[in-house]
């Protein structure tokens, strides 16, 4: 389906005289004539998502069978869109690869990706900072998602508050970012520290990493929601994808 980038490129070609208005009209009509969604019986694949939101529909692998994931993925790719499956199992990837042979599985982040169409590049850099090594799967979900959405990403991992010197050594990279995603479990203190050092938006991602009283990330979530530093927003527990989506929108403004 047509993306915002495709439409911008087409209009630019018309403005430069490289494509006539009649040909542009034919191309656009052909794109819009296609069904806005495809009913697979168990899912309705939204082919106009990229027009409304700038990026195609993303598949959440949780709760879907491998065959369902593969069928949705095949339909998305068939219409020329970029593929992103989050929380994907190895079994789901095997099923997807049977119909989308170019797909890639990112085991650390449990993502399936296949870039098929261009997206507008972000204006700056998104920095992904994570507190501990155990937080990296969520951080990688955010990093890979942001990259697929057209952003330049820098990773700063294992800089938790138990060793602040590790974080302070990265102040220049943090300050140069356009938006920062901070991933942390335990007590969730890292986003407040980072936000106190920079003048850019900080998106906090609590993770489910921690011992008993962390309550599966609830302690980190509440700590981040009660941050004393300004400029911090918070997404749901382990939601690296959601953080990356917001960061990408900010970076494309």
Where are the regions that the model predicts?
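Long amphipathic alpha-helical segments
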Residues: 1-89, 94, 99
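C-terminal binding/interaction regions
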Residues: 130, 134, 171-175, 179, ...
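Glycine-rich phosphate-binding loop
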Residues: 169-207
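Short glycine/serine/threonine-rich phosphate/pyrophosphate-binding segments
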Residues: 67-69, 135-140, 164-165, 184-194, ...
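Glycine-rich oxoanion-binding loops at beta->alpha junctions
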Residues: 111-113, 152-173, 218-219, 235
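Glycine-rich phosphate/diphosphate-binding loop of Rossmann-like nucleotide-binding domains
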Residues: 123-165
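Short glycine-rich or small-residue beta-strand-to-loop segments that form or flank ligand, phosphate
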Residues: 56-59, 83-84, 125-131, 180-182, ...
């Amino acid at each position: 389906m047509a993306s915002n980038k495709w439409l911008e490129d087409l209009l630019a070609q018309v403005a430069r005289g490289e494509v006539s208005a009649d040909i542009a009209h034919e191309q656009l009509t052909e794109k819009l004539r296609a069904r806005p969604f495809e009913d697979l019986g168990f899912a309705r694949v939204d082919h106009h998502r990229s027009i409304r939101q700038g990026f195609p529909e993303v598949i959440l692998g949780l709760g879907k069978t491998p065959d369902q994931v593969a069928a949705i993925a095949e339909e998305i790719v068939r219409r020329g869109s970029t593929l992103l499956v989050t929380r994907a199992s190895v079994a789901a990837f095997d099923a997807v690869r049977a119909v989308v042979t170019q797909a890639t599985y990112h085991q650390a982040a449990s993502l399936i990706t296949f870039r098929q169409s261009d997206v507008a590049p972000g204006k700056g850099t998104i920095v992904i900072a994570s507190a501990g090594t155990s937080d990296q799967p969520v951080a990688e979900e955010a990093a890979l998602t942001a990259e697929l959405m057209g952003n330049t990403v820098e990773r700063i991992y294992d800089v938790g508050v138990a060793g602040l010197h590790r974080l302070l050594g990265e102040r220049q990279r943090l300050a140069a970012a356009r938006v920062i995603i901070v991933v942390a479990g335990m007590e969730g203190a890292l986003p407040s520290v980072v936000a106190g050092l920079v003048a850019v938006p900080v998106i906090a991602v609590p993770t489910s990493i921690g011992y008993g009283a962390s309550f599966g990330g609830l302690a980190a979530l509440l700590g981040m929601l009660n941050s004393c530093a300004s400029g911090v927003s918070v997404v749901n527990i382990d939601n690296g994808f959601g953080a990356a989506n917001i960061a990408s929108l900010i970076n494309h403004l």
